[in-house]
């Protein structure tokens, strides 16, 4: 009887990838050592290379998963709160995270942008692609809100989304630098004003 080549997978690939995504989100690409990833994912080195091939490919898959999950979340929020409400809810979510934990993980795409641009140029194109994906998504929400009359600000949608993303990502950076609940509340108010 012929033996099967290789061992069958004894782990859930999707679960392992999700765990890796959260680890990259918390620690960044460079700081995520292979041994740490293996421990977090609950798999052996042979299984890692057989399934994910390399740390870089795992990171790429993690960034894809993060984007997919985020888009699904934002679209769900839009269904619940409308386009304008979904954009405001993202800022409220950041505020709640600060209230509950005193810090924020920020956005994996934006966190990766600074890190990859400086040291891992070969990953920069992927990060830029994901940034554009979020930009297009948020801009579509703004355009929809303007068409429905929920957003009466008639400023060009590209300008609004640029300011909006700057506020969201700036808020995360401020929290990591020591800003607290009061500062984020100011930005929540500013976002609401922007999207009036």
Would you name each region that the model predicts?
Residues 15, 23-57, 61:
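Helix-turn-helix
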Residues 1-3, 91-96, 132, 136-144, ...:
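C-terminal peripheral helix-coil segments that are non-catalytic and often amphipathic
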Residues 12-21, 37, 62-66, 70, ...:
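Generic hydrophobic, amphipathic alpha-helix propensity
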Residues 1-11:
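N-terminal intrinsically disordered/low-complexity leader segments
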Residues 100-122:
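Amphipathic alpha-helical segments used for helix-helix packing
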Residues 85, 121-147, 159, 189:
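Amphipathic alpha-helical packing segments from all-alpha helical-bundle domains
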Residues 105, 110, 153-174, 190-194:
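Hydrophobic alpha-helical segments that form the core
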Residues 61, 75-105, 157-164:
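Hydrophobic alpha-helical connector segments
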């Amino acid at each position: 009887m012929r033996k099967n080549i290789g061992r069958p997978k004894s782990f859930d690939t999707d679960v392992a990838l999700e765990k890796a995504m959260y680890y990259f989100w918390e620690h960044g690409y460079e700081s995520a050592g292979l041994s740490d990833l293996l421990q977090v994912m609950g798999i052996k080195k042979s299984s890692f290379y057989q399934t994910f091939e390399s740390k870089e490919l795992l990171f790429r898959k993690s960034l894809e998963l993060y984007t997919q999950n985020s888009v699904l979340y934002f679209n769900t929020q839009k269904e619940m709160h409308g386009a304008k409400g979904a954009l405001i809810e993202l800022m409220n979510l950041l505020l709640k995270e600060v209230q509950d934990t005193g810090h924020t993980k920020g956005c994996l795409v934006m966190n990766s942008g600074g890190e990859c641009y400086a040291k891992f140029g070969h990953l920069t194109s992927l990060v830029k692609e994901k940034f554009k994906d979020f930009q297009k998504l948020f801009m579509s929400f703004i355009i929809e809100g303007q068409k429905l009359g929920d957003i009466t600000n008639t400023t060009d949608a590209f300008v609004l989304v640029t300011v909006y993303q700057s506020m969201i990502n700036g808020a995360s950076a401020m929290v990591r630098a020591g800003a607290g609940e009061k500062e984020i509340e100011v930005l929540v108010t500013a976002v609401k004003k922007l999207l009036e």
